[in-house]
């Protein structure tokens, strides 16, 4: 971002923010769909039954822990690549 003027930096920041929001919404949508498909199968009531609610809670927890673990590994790999000078574009 060093070679950009203030307007270009703002535009880049706005684009990055929109991209992050889109990625978040995509991840959220996939989580909802996956947990719904895996856990909800009784459509005789408009509320979740206790078994479904427990399943959804475990599904969300598992997804969040997996995402956190993946993010940690990505950060470790990125740090290792930066330290060894293997980061793309450098």
Curated annotation (Swiss-Prot):
One of its GO terms (biological process) is protein transport. It is a peripheral membrane protein. One of its GO terms (molecular function) is metal ion binding. Keywords: Chaperone, Disulfide bond, Membrane, Metal-binding, Mitochondrion, Mitochondrion inner membrane, Protein transport, Translocation, Transport, Zinc. Its main location: mitochondrion. It comes from the Eukaryota. Belongs to the small Tim family. Mitochondrial intermembrane chaperone that participates in the import and insertion of multi-pass transmembrane proteins into the mitochondrial inner membrane. Also required for the transfer of beta-barrel precursors from the TOM complex to the sorting and assembly machinery (SAM complex) of the outer membrane. Acts as a chaperone-like protein that protects the hydrophobic precursors from aggregation and guide them through the mitochondrial intermembrane space. The twin CX3C motif contains 4 conserved Cys residues that form 2 disulfide bonds in the mitochondrial intermembrane space. However, during the transit of TIM9 from cytoplasm into mitochondrion, the Cys residues probably coordinate zinc, thereby preventing folding and allowing its transfer across mitochondrial outer membrane. This is Mitochondrial import inner membrane translocase subunit tim9. It comes from Emericella nidulans (strain FGSC A4 / ATCC 38163 / CBS 112.46 / NRRL 194 / M139).
